[in-house]
A protein has these predicted regions:
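Short, small-residue-biased leader/transition segments that mark boundaries at the very start
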Residues: 2-3
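N-terminal helix-turn-helix DNA-binding core of bacterial DNA-binding proteins
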Residues: 13-59, 83-90
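Conserved segment of winged-helix/HTH DNA-binding domains
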Residues: 20-21, 86-106
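Short, hydrophobic-biased segments on the C-terminal half of alpha helices
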Residues: 65-66
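Beta-hairpin "wing" of winged helix-turn-helix
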Residues: 69-79
Length: 106
């Protein structure tokens, strides 16, 4: 019906917001980055620890962490010479949990 279509159209987010959401899912759509996020969901970790857990080089881990940091999915803090990474906020943890639950159900 015409009113329903108009209501849907009026409630559609702005194009910029849709593009931001699309970029978010592109970053989340990489299996290596998902492994990093799932690791960081359990514990704050440094590059060496993440490389060990995922059996990757430190360079490869650093490259993926940069993408996650630029997308504001993770944050970092420095302690001495070591940089520790963690999820940026509880929204990321919730999204990961909901997505994981959804895939287990289907």
């Amino acid at each position: 019906d015409v009113y329903k279509r108009q209501e849907v159209k009026e409630n559609m987010p702005a194009f910029d917001e849709i593009m931001n959401l699309s970029d978010f899912f592109k970053v989340m759509g990489d299996s290596t980055r998902l492994q990093l996020l799932l690791s960081l969901q359990q514990s704050e970790m440094c590059v060496s620890d993440l490389a060990n857990v995922l059996d990757m080089t430190k360079s490869a881990v650093s490259h993926q962490l940069k993408a996650l940091r630029l997308s504001k999915l993770i944050k970092s803090r420095k302690e001495g010479k070591t940089v520790y990474y963690s999820l940026d906020d509880e929204h990321i943890e919730t999204i990961l949990g909901m997505a994981f639950d959804h895939t287990k159900e289907h």
